[in-house]
A protein has these predicted regions:
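Conserved P-loop
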Residues: 1-58, 62-65, 69-70, 74
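Short, well-ordered beta-strand core segments
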Residues: 25-26, 112, 149-151
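Conserved nucleotide-binding/hydrolysis micro-motifs of P-loop NTPases
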Residues: 31-34, 68-70, 118-122, 155-156, ...
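Structured loop/turn residues at beta-strand edges in well-structured enzyme cores
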Residues: 58, 108, 144
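P-loop NTPase motor core
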Residues: 67-141
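Conserved GTP-binding G-domain of TRAFAC-class P-loop NTPases and closely related GTPase folds
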Residues: 122-204
Length: 204
């Protein structure tokens, strides 16, 4: 089974910047430039079928979907004229099925990082992935589908806290680490004794 990792953060917090040192494939849901000089080969699509095909066919052991939240937004906007609540169930189901595909159909050495904006409740301070509102949140708890959720704050990752960040016990030495997905990738592979990206890790 593959491993999905959720990376949350506000715009400008360093989510996309964390990709810089990682040898990976990148799927852009919307076309925007990365915030650093790079030679990454990227594919831009919000089509779930194409994304699944790319995940299956990619030779990279680590793949980033940036920004995964726009999968929901894009489908919602394309279907904005549809009436009724069924479309929210379908939106939730499509996103849920993508995560299920990663965890059940991809090889174990594949790690897929889904970058999303965060939404913080002004009253409770609770942080969750930014979706398209309560009608979708009632259908699926996005963060509940992930064992590893990293929160990006001021160009650092929170790995465990009382909020949304979580990771398996002793995967990371501290609750706060640098926002470098190459470091995260190595920690995950070491923790689960995974193959993949070994030569790239040694070269960096």
């Amino acid at each position: 089974m593959g491993i999905p990792v959720l990376v949350l953060g506000r715009s400008g917090s360093g989510k996309s910047r964390s990709i810089k040192n990682l040898d990976c494939g990148i799927i852009k849901v919307i076309e925007k430039e990365l915030p650093f000089k790079n030679n990454f080969k990227t594919v831009t699509t919000s089509d779930y079928v194409k994304i699944i095909q790319i995940l299956m066919g990619s030779k990279k052991d680590s793949i980033v979907i940036d920004d995964a939240g726009y999968l929901l937004t894009d489908e919602f906007m394309r279907r904005a004229t549809e009436k009724g609540y069924d479309k929210f169930t379908e939106l939730a189901n499509n996103f849920y099925n993508l995560i299920q595909f990663i965890t059940t159909k991809l090889p174990r050495e594949k790690i897929v990082y889904l970058l999303m904006h965060e939404d913080e409740n002004e009253i409770t301070g609770q942080v969750k992935p930014k979706t398209i509102g309560k009608l979708l949140d009632e259908k699926v708890c996005v963060e509940g589908m992930f064992t590893i959720v990293l929160r990006c704050i001021e160009h650092k990752f929170l790995t465990n806290n009382s909020g949304c960040a979580k990771s398996p016990e002793e995967m990371f030495e501290t609750e706060e680490i640098e926002n470098d997905l190459n470091v995260v990738d190595k920690a995950i592979r070491d923790y689960y004794n995974l193959g993949g990206n070994e030569n790239d890790q040694q070269a960096k």
